[in-house]
């Protein structure tokens, strides 16, 4: 297993000014960092590459749909722009040296049209990711599509649907990011959710039920790690939380209070817990 932490605890816009964070993160016991990428053209590629080289860490990339772009829009022009944005981000992911780009890469987070998704929207997402599959393979990058809870998206919520989506996409470079925070809301049993997505599981977010420190809430971690071991997953375990001092991110994630004594305590206490659970 490799242990990662999303830099959204500290910043939503990584640049060279954040490089001093990386040695501290390394010293806390992490193998890598996860960095948010909005648009590849604006990403601090050189700064991140330097920070990783200096610390011996690796990275993964997380991404979301920006500028109201969507793979499920009924407007073909919007879908085409969304595919091009993802192509750009995939290429930049490879340029950084990362192998994973993960996130709810289908529709904007928080877009809730007040109805169920349609069969046509589903087909659009499948078609778009089938277009992107060869581009991912060319760049030796894997996309891990993330189901979110029902309060953040209407399109993809459950392990069953995520596995079916990847079955229909049918490309080995397209899989699933499964996050315990969202699974705690949407799954009857989180561990069984991991078993359901096993054949497509590419990335894991180890997050507590309140997005606080792993091990401090009611996620049944023993069962989760038993399932992860059972299915043979040996990739990243990444802590994702959000600093309350980042208003735009805190508002989007509905973080209205402190989740720990300090935002970074979620990460530094959390990784000790994860290492204990996986020892």
Give the ranges of each region predicted by the language model.
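Residue-level detector of anion-binding/catalytic polar loops
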Residues: 31-32, 58, 99, 142, ...
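Conserved beta-strand positions in the central sheet of alpha/beta enzyme cores
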Residues: 34, 61-63, 102, 144, ...
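A short acidic, helix-capping loop that chelates divalent metal ions and anchors anionic groups
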Residues: 68-73, 109-115, 151-152, 185-186, ...
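Active-site-proximal loop/turn and secondary-structure-junction residues that shape catalytic pockets
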Residues: 9-11, 37-39, 65-68, 105-109, ...
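Histidine-acidic metal/acid-base catalytic patches
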Residues: 1-7, 11, 15-26, 97-99, ...
């Amino acid at each position: 297993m490799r242990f990662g932490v999303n830099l959204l605890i500290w910043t939503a816009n990584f640049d060279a000014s954040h490089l001093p964070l990386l040695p501290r993160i390394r010293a806390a016991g992490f193998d890598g960092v996860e960095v948010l990428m909005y648009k590849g053209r604006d990403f601090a590629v050189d700064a991140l590459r330097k920070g990783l080289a200096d610390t011996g860490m690796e990275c993964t990339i997380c991404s979301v749909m920006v500028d109201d772009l969507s793979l499920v829009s009924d407007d073909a022009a919007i879908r085409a722009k969304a595919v091009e944005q993802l192509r750009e981000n995939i290429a930049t992911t490879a340029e950084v040296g990362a192998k994973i780009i993960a996130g709810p890469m289908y529709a904007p987070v928080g877009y809730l049209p007040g109805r169920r998704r349609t069969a046509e929207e589903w087909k659009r997402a499948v078609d778009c990711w089938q277009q992107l599959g060869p581009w991912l393979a060319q760049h030796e990058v894997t996309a891990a599509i993330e189901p979110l809870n029902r309060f953040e998206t209407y399109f993809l919520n459950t392990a069953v649907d995520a596995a079916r989506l990847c079955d229909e996409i049918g490309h080995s470079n397209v899989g699933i990011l499964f996050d315990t925070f969202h699974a705690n809301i949407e799954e009857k049993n989180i561990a069984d959710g991991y078993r359901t997505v096993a054949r497509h599981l590419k990335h894991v977010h180890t997050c507590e039920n309140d997005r606080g420190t792993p091990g401090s809430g009611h996620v049944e971690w023993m069962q989760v790690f038993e399932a992860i071991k059972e299915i043979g997953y040996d990739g990243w375990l990444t802590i994702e939380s959000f600093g309350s001092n980042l208003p735009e991110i805190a508002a989007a994630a509905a973080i209205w209070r402190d989740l720990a004594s300090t935002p970074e305590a979620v990460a530094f206490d959390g990784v000790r817990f994860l290492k204990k659970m996986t020892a």
